[in-house]
Amino acid sequence: VAPFSDEQIKALLEQNLEIFNHIFTRQITRISEGNARLAVLAGKLALDKRTLESIRDVSGIYESYYGDFLNGRILNQNNNLIGCAGIIAFMNVINLSEMGSLDFCLEELGIDRKRFEDCVRYLHDQEIVDIYHNQVIKISDQCVGNYLVKHVFVDEQIIPLSTMVGNLFVTRKTAVVETVSMLTHVFASPDVMEKVRREICLVWDELQQADKTLFREFVKMFYAFRPVETLILLNDEIDSLPGEEFDIDEVDFAQKRNHISVNDEIVNIRELPEALDLLFEYYAKYPSKFMEIYHAITRYLSIDKDSHTNDYWTQIQLVSKFQQDIENGLNHNMSLLFIRAASELLKLEFSPVEAGKHNTVIFYDIPLVVTEGSKTYRSMIWETLQTLYNHERYRSYIEALLVEYSNQ
């Protein structure tokens, strides 16, 4: 039976269990990986407990659903076989003709490629993996793969997670990032989170000493595991920058508005409220980053699927920071950035885009909800625009904003 799509899982939950809360359906879709029965089990647990916490760590569901199946086939075997299954699950797909980057795994297990291939054939006989053209190996069931990754690299540490991450980050970055993300979203117990954090930090410390270029890339992917250290690193980097002179009025905003690009790691950091301080300090030194910072604000700090749940806390923090830094219109660069951002934040409907599983993209249509939080941040925007309108140089920008607002 082919796995269900995310939309099919969502429909299953709505029609059979009457679960309509998008936060619950999103988490259940993530953990079920297209397995309808697993989705129903998770849905029933969520209904019974009435809390999101009940389905943050689904180790129990996985254990009850896959435990006997795997114990009877491989988990009661030797570590070589279990380790091989874990390696395939970590990578999701392996081509036997391109095994060079995985030699370190075989060394960890103390086996050669022939023994690995013998294990693959046994796993195929046990319906754990599929083999295509006698060459390409793929885990048969994504949820089984998730279970094996946790068992091999976190619970039993047959191969340490840090060994996999450290050796594969350059050559198989996507597999590394997706696997770590899966562990922290599907098995989000304090114990698993701490074990994963510890392993990631081992690689962090090693790269910080050994390879500065690779370390920057690693921090970009895994800053959430050490947010304070990341902010300190970025703050030191910003302090060391010389700054520049740039005429912000020369930016062709209309032409660049829809050409979204946010590649700078300083602009990408999202740990509030400290990140706002860094973002604005960086902009003060490099006003030529105007469009990239504008796009970072509209992509990461505008309304998303969680804004209503959080009563628009992020938007209140953002506008408050703008109010501090525009200096009643005396800071021209900051004032102009605020006006451009305000045009986005004053919309009544929002269409954010989010990265989904396995290189997919999720599109949302989110209407503004009238709450104390939404009224607060919007009132703050209008008050600040009124202050800026007292300055002749901003009137044309604000009048254009009002025309755009009236056309919604």
Show the residue positions of the predicted features.
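C-lobe helix-loop cap of protein kinase catalytic domains
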Residues: 28-33, 120, 124
